[in-house]
């Protein structure tokens, strides 16, 4: 597929520091004695992050196996790689920002990648300062240097969206450094004091706080309001040929959503801990609580039209949208609605 290099490279920013230090690899769903009867499904996720807790609950609690699916989870480390895996057929389902499907649509994809379930409804990153600022206001960024995200990626676009909402011009009122690789901003923040702020995903935000090197002063998720940040998608052709698999997959995810809505951050952290072996339980719990408290996860997986239009508004505002896509072309809500009915 022909992709706009800069856009696709910038999309990789969405993974960033939300990625816990795990080797790129494959994670299998729990299997039971009916293993040989399970249908194999490959899911490529943009990042392996506590931000996506309901998905890991569904894996660790065996919900996919209950629905007859043998799920293989592969971390793509970038929406460009995840989208490529879906389009090539290497992955059956992709998990990434829905803007990736809009970009592919703009490029003239003949078999569009359709979003069928929305997991997160807020941005997952935080503004970190060098000192505690209990009375922080977005106007405090005027004249300052901030380590930001890649152009065209959701983290950076949402950040600029917030600045504009607060009457600021991202190009004139402050300096946003977009030159640092997505996995290196936290290290750059601690080694070079030229920037007063950095925009960080977890676990980097919490780690900076634990080290006394930075302090979370604002949540981009709270400041932006509800935004369709990450969703599940597949090729229209795969959806047509494997409707039953998509429904079972969505049903299992909904059970994961139900779990996080009815359990404490401590309980959620214990369940997903095996997915983050290199992060201690205390840190996992703190991160889950931070996301839990800001209402990160939807109660259902339905990707509403208003959310899709808001996403395109943000893309348009950032100068990344050639032409608007029709909601019906890139979103299918049937499976998510059925999953809610089955509860």
Predicted segments, located by residue:
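Short, low-complexity disordered leader/linker segments with a strong preference
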Residues: 1-40, 339-343
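Conserved C-terminal helix/tail region of periplasmic/extracytoplasmic solute-binding proteins
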Residues: 309-343
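Short amphipathic alpha-helical segments at helix boundaries and their inter-helical linkers
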Residues: 91-95, 292-305, 335-343
């Amino acid at each position: 597929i022909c992709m706009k290099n800069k856009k696709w490279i910038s999309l990789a920013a969405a993974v960033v520091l939300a990625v816990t230090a795990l080797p790129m690899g494959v994670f299998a769903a729990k299997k039971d004695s009916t293993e040989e009867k399970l249908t194999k499904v490959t899911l490529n996720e943009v990042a392996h992050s506590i931000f996506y807790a309901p998905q890991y609950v569904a894996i660790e609690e065996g919900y996919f196996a209950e629905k007859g699916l043998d799920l293989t989870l592969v971390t793509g480390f970038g929406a460009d790689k995840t989208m490529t895996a879906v389009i090539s057929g290497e992955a059956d389902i992709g998990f990434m920002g829905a803007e990736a499907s809009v970009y592919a649509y703009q490029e003239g994809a003949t078999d569009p990648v359709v979003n069928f379930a929305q997991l997160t409804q807020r941005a997952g990153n935080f503004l970190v300062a060098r000192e505690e600022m209990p009375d922080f206001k977005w106007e405090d960024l005027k004249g300052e240097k901030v380590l930001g995200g890649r152009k065209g990626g959701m983290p950076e676009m949402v950040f600029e969206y917030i600045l504009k909402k607060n009457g600021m011009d991202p190009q004139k009122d402050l300096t946003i450094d977009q030159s640092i690789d997505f996995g290196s901003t936290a290290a750059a923040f601690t080694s070079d004091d030229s920037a007063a702020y950095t925009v960080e995903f977890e676990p980097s935000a919490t780690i900076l706080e634990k080290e006394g090197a930075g302090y979370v002063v604002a949540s981009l998720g709270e400041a932006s309001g509800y935004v369709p940040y990450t969703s599940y998608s597949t090729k229209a052709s795969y959806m047509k040929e494997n409707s039953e698999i998509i429904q079972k997959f969505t049903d299992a995810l909904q059970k994961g959503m139900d779990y996080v809505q009815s359990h404490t951050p401590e309980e959620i952290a214990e369940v997903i801990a095996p997915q983050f072996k290199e992060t201690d339980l205390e840190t996992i719990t703190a991160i889950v609580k931070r996301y839990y408290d800001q209402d990160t996860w939807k109660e259902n997986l339905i990707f509403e039209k208003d959310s899709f239009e808001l996403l395109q508004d943000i893309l348009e505002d950032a100068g990344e949208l050639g032409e608007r896509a029709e909601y019906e072309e890139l979103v299918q809500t049937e499976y998510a609605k059925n999953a809610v009915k089955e509860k």
